[in-house]
Amino acid sequence: YFSLPVDRGKIYIVKFIIGCAIVFIDVAAFILSVIVVGKLIGLEGPVPYETILIKPLAAYFAALPIIAIIYVLSVSYTQMALPLGIGTCSALPAMLVANTKYWITYPWSYPIMAALGGDFDVFNKGSVTYIISTFLLIAVFSYGYCTFIKRDIA
């Protein structure tokens, strides 16, 4: 039973889902820790659950295209250094790019804009972030899927 052939497309999809689930668990742990630490140190006033829950989840959904880009790079190259280096080097200027009018062209700034609601002074484009993120996620994931199932096993 365990040695039956497995479809390459299913492997690609399941590995991506597992990667997204691990990142989601990290986000959930962050949300939970913020609430617990707030209670432990005795912060006064009502807990802003909407802000504590919505902002990190918005950033998570806007980061899905980044996860897809790094995933496609990691299955395309045998060396781990390339996707890791690209991911790290691309994340560093994200806050600087998010403060410009060119943020829309830089996927690493999407989580920042989504978490802020797209409410930097000049840029009020919160919903645009999710639309572009969705299209970019579908495009990158589809490209990676097609190249993965056609690739030689060597």
Residue positions per predicted region:
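Secretory targeting signals
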Residues: 13-77, 117-131
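Terminal transmembrane helical anchor/hairpin motif
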Residues: 84, 88-154
